[in-house]
Amino acid sequence: MAAMAVGGAGGSRVSSGRDLNCVPEIADTLGAVAKQGFDFLCMPVFHPRFKREFIQEPAKNRPGPQTRSDLLLSGRDWNTLIVGKLSPWIHPDSKVEKIRRNSEAAMLQELNFGAYLGLPAFLLPLNQEDNTNLARVLTNHIHTGHHSSMFWMRVPLVAPEDLRDDVIANAPTTHTEEYSGEEKTWMWWHNFRTLCDYSKRIAVALEIGADLPSNHVIDRWLGEPIKAAILPTSIFLTNKKGFPVLSKVQQRLIFRLLKLEVQFIITGTNHHSEKEFCSYLQYLEYLSQNRPPPNAYELFAKGYEDYLQSPLQPLMDNLESQTYEVFEKDPIKYSQYQQAIYKCLLDRVPEEEKETNVQVLMVLGAGRGPLVNASLRAAKQAERRIRLYAVEKNPNAVVTLENWQFEEWGSQVTVVSSDMREWVAPEKADIIVSELLGSFADNELSPECLDGAQHFLKDDGVSIPGEYTSFLAPISSSKLYNEVRACREKDRDPEAQFEMPYVVRLHNFHQLSAPKPCFTFSHPNRDPMIDNNRYCTLEFPVEVNTVLHGFAGYFETVLYRDITLSIRPETHSPGMFSWFPIFFPIKQPITVHEGQNICVRFWRCSNSKKVWYEWAVTAPVCSSIHNPTGRSYTIGL
């Protein structure tokens, strides 16, 4: 009946639903809503004014059907086109025991009937501070039966009483909530999902009002699992031609919600009576088509959003051909390397020596040859002579290098099949070039590799890169917390998955504070006693009530002089997609209040066979130390 079902947001088309409080003829209404262009219908499963009695006789045993028959629609239509709504008279957190008990029974009846119909989602309101019993009833329902419905918690962006303009100055307030208006509704949601133990089946349907809260409050909401945005018709303005439009600030919020692929629900009556109701939906389609286009990084990362991957271990494992292929497609990385090598050659070889001075250049970890090609292009560009060694430990990639040499490079390049730490070089290098960096800079053991190879670098020799620094930032993300929790393995400690980092394209998250530098490594390392173990303490100020789920890791590197690469958001190399950020989770979410500092301790540890990280939060409260002795995660030397 409709082009797209509930949960089918994707592509360039807006997925949308119509919210109605009363639906006398369900099949006719569904047909009319589909004709207007909507994909699904939000409606009460029971008549909203039919207050059932579950406790007292004789009303308890009133005869007749409780609601309409499921035969009015096909199973497929119930499964894909209807979102259920709880009857408005149900108050499971009422202080009046009779109302509470009756509401519990009615709520379970409606949820069970929704499960019987196979509804894809069910809307439940969060409109007060105390929702503890609502959480209990819903959690009990989720843990019984084999249904798979999602539960969308309808949360206003700003609490309704905070929008009243008739509040008398100095009048006593009836509530004792400790949070300001724009903080309040997020706290309702945060407490509710905590009571429900972060269930993956409970998500947010965010109701947008005419007034928006401050930007940091919106940023925080965008780190939550928002599945739907509810837009009342009353918030739409009217343009010169009489069509509904949204204000500029609301448009910006819609653009951000579109990035999260939320579904939109239009609620309320037509406030633009000269126009068809579908004009609200047409305006959303217009916004979708006119939003800023995705950049190269977003296009490359499509489909990888919030998808956890284990960091590569190229020192311990031999990479596959497809992995090399992905990295080689990066348009920025190798042009920056070429520029760095070009500048280095010009600095080391004056114009008058360009015919006689042959620079020895070693590519350490040559892979399938992209850095070799970048080096040859740089030498040609600089009009300088080089003799090149391509050192690679992966015997499979060496096959590719030898083919390159036979077909293209010739005697200018010597291919060496060896671990760089064990290779006995026939001569010393003027320049060593490597691409051994991971998402957290040193997490693919670049320091150990380059330290082991620097004995064949001349005393005045140059390493490209010359320096790299890791960065950490605290983040909040229900999505990532649940993804990590789902990574539990049968024969391991039940919390081992929280003691390892993950490479991930961060998407549905909120960064709580700007990244700060963690560990820095420089090459060549001339210290008489080289020690790559590290320890740092980082403090992050937090300006909003929030919850901490872990830390995002980034890096910056100086290839040579002013030539850099970065995945830190503030300095990200435009168009570069070789690295996604890294994520260090924590076992238990930590509530953080506005004005508090987050303090994290980070260690880089090693022994003769492996390297690992340990981490712990020490403020605002202490967590346990994660990954002691590398018990859950190590990087093999």
Curated annotation (Swiss-Prot):
S-adenosyl-L-methionine binds at Y324, K333, Y334, E392, D419, M420. A protein binds at F327, E435, E444. The active site is at E435 (proton donor/acceptor), E444 (proton donor/acceptor). Residues 465-637 are annotated as: Beta barrel. Residues 488-494 are annotated as: Dimerization. Pfam families: PRMT5, PRMT5_C, PRMT5_TIM. Activity is increased by EGF, HGF, FGF1 or FGF2 treatments, and slightly decreased by NGF treatment. It catalyses: L-arginyl-[protein] + 2 S-adenosyl-L-methionine = N(omega),N(omega)'-dimethyl-L-arginyl-[protein] + 2 S-adenosyl-L-homocysteine + 2 H(+). It comes from the Eukaryota. One of its GO terms (biological process) is positive regulation of mRNA splicing, via spliceosome. One of its GO terms (molecular function) is methyl-CpG binding. It is found in: Cytoplasm; Nucleus; Golgi apparatus. The record marks F327 as: Critical for specifying symmetric addition of methyl groups. InterPro entries: Arg_MeTrfase (IPR025799), Arg_MeTrfase_PRMT5 (IPR007857), PRMT5 (IPR035075), PRMT5_C (IPR035248), PRMT5_TIM (IPR035247), SAM-dependent_MTases_sf (IPR029063). Signal peptide: none annotated. Keywords: Acetylation, Biological rhythms, Chromatin regulator, Cytoplasm, Golgi apparatus, Methyltransferase, Nucleus, Repressor, S-adenosyl-L-methionine, Transcription, Transcription regulation, Transferase. Its EC number is 2.1.1.320. Its main location: cytoplasm. Residues 308-615 form the SAM-dependent MTase PRMT-type domain. Residues 13-292 are annotated as: TIM barrel. One of its GO terms (cellular component) is male germ cell nucleus. The modification N-acetylalanine is found at A2. Arginine methyltransferase that can both catalyze the formation of omega-N monomethylarginine (MMA) and symmetrical dimethylarginine (sDMA), with a preference for the formation of MMA. Specifically mediates the symmetrical dimethylation of arginine residues in the small nuclear ribonucleoproteins Sm D1 (SNRPD1) and Sm D3 (SNRPD3); such methylation being required for the assembly and biogenesis of snRNP core particles. Methylates SUPT5H and may regulate its transcriptional elongation properties. May methylate the N-terminal region of MBD2. Forms, at least, homodimers and homotetramers. Component of the methylosome complex, composed of PRMT5, WDR77 and CLNS1A. Found in a complex composed of PRMT5, WDR77 and RIOK1. RIOK1 and CLNS1A associate with PRMT5 in a mutually exclusive fashion, which allows the recruitment of distinct methylation substrates, such as nucleolin/NCL and Sm proteins, respectively. Interacts with PRDM1. Identified in a complex composed of methylosome and PRMT1 and ERH. Interacts with EGFR; methylates EGFR and stimulates EGFR-mediated ERK activation. Interacts with HOXA9. Interacts with SRGAP2. Belongs to the class I-like SAM-binding methyltransferase superfamily. Protein arginine N-methyltransferase family. This is Protein arginine N-methyltransferase 5. It comes from Mus musculus. The gene is Prmt5.
